[in-house]
């Protein structure tokens, strides 16, 4: 089991800018499903639109890895669901996370987006996996 260290709490308490650079902490915590750290970071001003070196946001990574509660939190905090490539929805679909797909669609993701063939395949795959 991957666990994030306690350091974000210590850094924030000592005045560190947790949004500096790529904000690896919120990205990694979202990817590995550490809800409490993600919530703490958001409550203390972390950038929910941070992008890692591969172009993924916290919402992308939590959707890809099936971390529903983190996805829900990020959506509630107005993380961008609609991107030019519909990547977040594709990642959730490809990995069979129907509950996350439903949440994303209910909050504005468009499954008909430009007749995106890869999205259609991903949605079919998600249904098969569920």
From Swiss-Prot:
Positions annotated as ANK repeat: 21-50, 54-83, 85-113
Alphabetical list of Pfam families matching this protein: Ank (PF00023), Ank_2 (PF12796)
InterPro entries xrefs: Ankyrin_rpt, Ankyrin_rpt-contain_sf
This protein's UniProt keywords: ANK repeat, Repeat
SMART domains found in the cross-reference section: ANK (SM00248)
PANTHER family: ANKYRIN REPEAT PROTEIN, GH09064P
Listed name of the protein: Putative ankyrin repeat protein R886
Organism annotation: Acanthamoeba polyphaga mimivirus (APMV)
């Amino acid at each position: 089991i991957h666990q994030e260290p306690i350091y974000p709490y210590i850094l924030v308490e000592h005045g560190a800018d947790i949004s500096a650079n790529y904000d690896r902490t919120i990205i990694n915590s979202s990817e590995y499903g550490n809800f409490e750290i993600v919530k703490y970071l958001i409550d203390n001003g972390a950038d929910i639109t941070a992008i890692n070196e591969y172009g993924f946001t916290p919402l992308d990574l939590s959707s890809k890895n099936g971390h529903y509660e983190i996805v829900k939190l990020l959506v509630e905090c107005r993380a961008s669901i609609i991107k030019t490539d519909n990547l977040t929805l594709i990642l959730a679909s490809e990995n069979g996370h129907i509950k996350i797909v439903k949440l994303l669609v209910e909050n504005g993701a468009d499954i008909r987006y430009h007749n995106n063939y890869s999205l259609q395949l991903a949605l079919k795959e998600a249904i098969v996996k569920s």
